[in-house]
Amino acid sequence: VMLTVGILSVSLFTSYFIIATGYFSSSSTNAIKEDIINRHDGITIADIDNVRSDFYECVDNTAMFWQIQSINCFQSSVSTSIMQFYDALGITRDVASRPDLDVYGLRPFLSCKYLFDYRGDGKSGSLNSIVDENGNTRMPGWKYLRTQNRFDIYRNEYYIPMGYTFDKFIAEEEFDLVTNAHKSEALLYAMVLPRDLMKKYSDITGYSDEKYKLLYGKHPEDYDSITEKFDYSNSDYKKVCNLRALNSCTSFEYTDNGFKALYN
């Protein structure tokens, strides 16, 4: 009898536990059903399909549900070049691309124009919010636009359209000399090229074996690189973004087999 009572007690407890777990789990998934899945039409931004967006502390792959371009992605199998890119910036990229806020220069570099901050997971000032306790955005240059699908949407005032040009060039080894804290901003100042391309296009890059012998010698830290003249204040960050934007394509749109862009 005691054995039967024990079995019944365990069975009842297990049943209640499963029901309760299912209830709370379903509550947490309601937000996904109501605000994310099949809600692309709830986002009314004219150019959303032709720019990249950022999703701060949101459900992974929200952009995929909405079928829009994003710098965020939970995908373990990606191109080797993506892994190399993040590694060059000193950023760990394991199974997902989720660039931290301190590498804010990566946003304009990747032509990221909008940021989505889900309102259902925390109030302003919490770590789940792009807005700090003083009401300021945690990255420079972002301005509140509107709220849709329970997402606060911010626009990048330092946005650089896709397809922009550089007039300065640095070798990969020069870029390695920049501290990780400023590498995302350094990307906005000069195009980073491997040594063979620096040499191949020396009439443009200014490369010469004599000029770069220190960089490729035993003491590369003694090389006088233009990266030492890059400034990383907020005002300089704004200036370099505006400069890149002035030298960008006048129009850009995706096509079935790539993209179409116009540059005047």
Give, region by region, the residue ranges found by the protein language model.
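Extracytoplasmic/lumenal acceptor-recognition loop(s) of multi-pass membrane glycoenzymes
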Residues: G6-S25, D35, R39-C112, Y159-D222
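Cytosolic-side transmembrane helix boundary signature
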Residues: V1-T4
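Short conserved active-site loop signatures built around small residues
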Residues: T29-A31
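Flexible, solvent-exposed extracytoplasmic
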Residues: L106, S111-N264
